[in-house]
A protein has these predicted regions:
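Short Trp-Ser/Thr-centered turn/loop motifs at beta-strand boundaries
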Residues: 137, 643, 680-685
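Solvent-exposed loop/turn segments flanking beta-strands in beta-repeat/beta-sandwich domains
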Residues: 55-63, 69-76, 603-631
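Beta-strand-rich modules
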Residues: 660-675
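Recognizes extended acidic, P/S/T-rich segments that occur
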Residues: 93-105, 114-115, 615-661
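Conserved NTP-binding catalytic cores of kinases and kinase-like/nucleotidyltransferase enzymes
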Residues: 43-45, 62, 149-295, 626-631, ...
Length: 695
């Protein structure tokens, strides 16, 4: 059941003027409005109820509803929005769908014939008291002045060829994508006028941030009405043909996004960014289908850097009467897109960051995108920070006081791992000032031009040459990069992430999938030929030897191997680090929780021993829930337990039993540090499964 509660939509009924010792009659409140089912199918009766509390006398309620058919969208500013409403009385008689007479819950049933596939139905409630005074729900001041539901019978199958006009039989072959394939990735339906959609995405070529058009977004059966939208992006906003979108939700009606596994994010979104999953054609990487950013942002996040959540979706735009015309380049299906969490106050809440100032950085300066409570409003905090590091060399204490160095080392490490070098022009990152620590953090953004050494930029963001030239900072940075190489950016762990993400949008067995349907929709779409340049036709999978999506995944995995070798040779070549320790055999790969004892080799290195530490992390595919694809697989960089740094060498450790669970698989490692602050590589792991208790 869809419900919105309206505590501030009321009729004020006064028995007499308020004065000392004189009571005011209770105000008539419309406390709740709901409809069921939440997303009806064709031919279903829809029940609408409204609850009224503290009735001061006879009250009547009625519903007004407006029908919006496919291809006939009605904007909020259209005259038809004001006039095209039909009236039905609601009742509290215990009849005609009402459950109980006189309980203050009013009911009306919208007839089955009203529900037609792809139809949007808006409604609002009006209450009238015995004196003729009226009020409505939603309130007239509400940014969404009506409720709504969307009638839908399910995503249909779709058919398309790689190039229906080709002389190549393989490209011309029509492939049928059945409804199960088309429903394998969550769908967002967007209802608007055809001209509004075309103007925003192709015709007007507007480079500004003004939201000129509105539409209705439907996700998980919930309707977000009168949402503003525009194309998004910088200099290449309209260059790819299949362009990016940005939606701005109404105040008080944030968007409940869900991840790739259907789980709702903890914090709702005020804005929705859609990546087009198309890549700039001249870089040869088209067909990665959003994998670069999905995996890339996961790497940032796993390394401890606050980074946008992402999830895939298929965008279905309803601006025509027909859902699936014979022309594969028309109709509702617009292909595969990647949703990116907007970097704003919602982002800070989602990532558990204190409420501080957040700046979108462009052209060497910043625009306040979120104002933290109690923080400055004139950007003086940003100006002071930038002025300080741009004028003269700052000493180590200044950097430690003003920049979150631990976070920066992780940020810089992932920049190197995925070649996120498009940061050199003062863009593609945000600055965030943590009000509790007083330190600035860098938050990554726009990481599509990655995973290949020919991508744009030289990687020279503001802190690389200013921070990492300090010897102490350089050692600390290398320590972190070395750890990320051991535990995250390696063929096994990053390869696991690549496979995990790819399985969301493609069939691991090689059957038809959304990536194939998207390729059929866009590789030879007429708009790609008209635009040319970074668009162009027939550019999917150029980087893959096998010329398919599976080949693009192999290209990413090969890049991990090659880039890791480059990092080791060029960024981590330090002969002074301690030797990598070894773990001595545990005697069994099946251990009980109370017998988790391990030993390591002696310290070895050119420097004097200073410290050591141990860690335990989950490893491998876990049982049950992961087989059902309802959760992500564990990554080794996320420890379940880490020891404190031990200043005295002790070759033995016993893992606390409470940190592991029976039936799970874990890895234990050890690491050594010398007196110069250099940490060794982590030891090769011992992997073990925790056996259930005996008996």
């Amino acid at each position: 059941m869809h419900t919105r509660i309206w505590f501030f939509c009321w009729l004020t009924i006064l028995a007499q003027p308020a004065s000392a010792g004189v009571e005011v009659e209770p105000r008539l409140q419309i406390q709740g409005v709901s409809h069921s089912p939440e997303q009806p199918r064709s031919g279903q009766v829809v029940k609408i109820v409204a609850q009224v509390a503290n009735q001061p006398g006879k009250v009547s309620l009625h519903v007004e509803y407006q029908v919006v058919d496919p291809g006939k969208y009605i904007d909020l500013t259209d005259s038809a929005y004001k006039t095209n409403w039909l009236y039905l009385a609601m009742n509290d008689s215990g009849k005609n769908g009402d459950e109980k007479a006189g309980d203050g819950i009013y009911t009306v049933e919208l007839p089955a014939e009203l529900q037609i596939h792809r139809r949007l139905v808006r409604y609002r409630i009006t209450a009238t008291d015995s004196s003729g005074q009226t009020n409505t729900a939603p309130a007239l001041s509400d940014s969404e002045p009506n409720f709504a539901y969307f009638v839908y019978d399910g995503i249909p199958g779709w058919s398309g060829a790689i190039d229906p006009n080709s002389n190549d039989p393989r490209k011309k072959q029509i492939v049928r994508y059945d409804p199960a394939v088309m429903a394998s990735v969550q769908a967002y339906h967007f209802i608007s006028k055809g001209r509004s959609v075309a103007n925003a995405t192709w015709r007007e070529q507007s480079g500004g941030k003004e939201y000129k058009y509105t539409g209705t977004l439907v996700s998980d059966g919930k309707v977000y009405d009168h949402v503003r939208f525009r194309a998004r992006g910088g200099v290449w906003r309209y260059a790819m043909g299949k362009n990016m979108w940005k939606f701005d939700f109404n105040k008080g009606h944030p968007f409940q996004a869900r991840d790739d596994y259907g789980q709702p994010y903890r914090v709702k979104w005020g804005k929705l960014n859609l990546r087009a999953c198309i890549q700039q054609g001249d870089y040869g990487q088209r067909g990665e289908q959003g994998m670069f950013e999905s995996v890339g942002f996961r790497l940032f996040s796993l390394a401890g850097v606050a980074a946008p959540r992402t999830h895939w979706l298929q965008l279905r735009i309803i601006d025509l009467a027909e859902e699936n015309p014979t022309n594969q380049y028309r109709g509702d299906f617009w292909g595969l897109y990647l949703a990116l969490e907007n970097e704003d106050g919602h982002f800070l809440d989602e990532h558990g960051l204190p409420d501080g100032n957040l700046y979108k950085m462009e052209n060497g300066s910043g625009t306040l995108s979120h104002h933290g409570t109690g923080a400055v409003t004139n950007s003086s905090d940003l100006h002071q920070f930038m002025s300080a590091y741009n004028t003269g060399n700052r000493a180590e204490p200044w950097w430690r006081a003003h920049l979150d160095l631990a976070s920066y080392y992780s940020y810089r490490s992932i920049i190197e791992c995925i070649h996120h070098y498009d940061v050199a022009d003062g863009k593609n990152y945000d600055y965030y000032l943590n009000p509790k620590t007083g330190r600035w953090n860098v938050i990554p953004w726009d990481i599509d031009l990655t995973w290949a050494d020919n991508m744009y930029g030289n990687g020279e963001e503001p802190f690389r040459s200013r921070v990492l030239t300090h010897p102490a900072f350089h050692v600390e940075y290398q320590n972190r990069l070395r750890e990320i190489r051991d535990l995250l950016f390696n063929p096994e762990q990053t390869g696991q992430l690549i496979d995990e993400c790819a399985a969301i949008i493609a069939d691991p067995a090689g059957g038809p999938s959304l990536v194939d349907a998207d390729r059929a929709k866009w590789d030879y779409h007429p708009v790609m030929a008209r635009i040319g340049g970074k668009a162009g036709q027939g550019r999917f999978y150029e980087a893959a030897a096998s010329k398919d999506f599976r080949g693009m995944l192999k290209s990413m995995k090969d890049y991990v191997k090659n880039r890791a070798a480059w990092i080791d040779a060029n960024l981590l070549n330090d002969p002074r680090i301690p030797a990598t320790p070894s773990l001595l055999g545990a005697g069994s790969t099946n251990l009980t929780r109370n017998h988790l004892s391990f030993r390591c080799s002696q310290y070895s290195g050119s420097g004097v021993f200073a410290a050591m530490k141990w860690r335990v992390a989950e490893a491998g595919k876990q049982p049950a829930e992961f087989g059902q694809a309802k959760a992500r697989m564990p990554c080794e960089i996320t420890a379940v337990w880490e020891s404190a740094e031990g200043a005295a060498f002790n070759p033995s450790i016993t893992i606390p039993p409470e940190v592991v669970r029976a039936g799970r698989t874990y890895r234990v490692r050890v690491q050594m540090k010398d007196q110069t602050g250099r940490w060794s590589y982590w030891s090769a792991p011992i992997q073990f499964t925790v056996a259930p208790p005996a008996g």
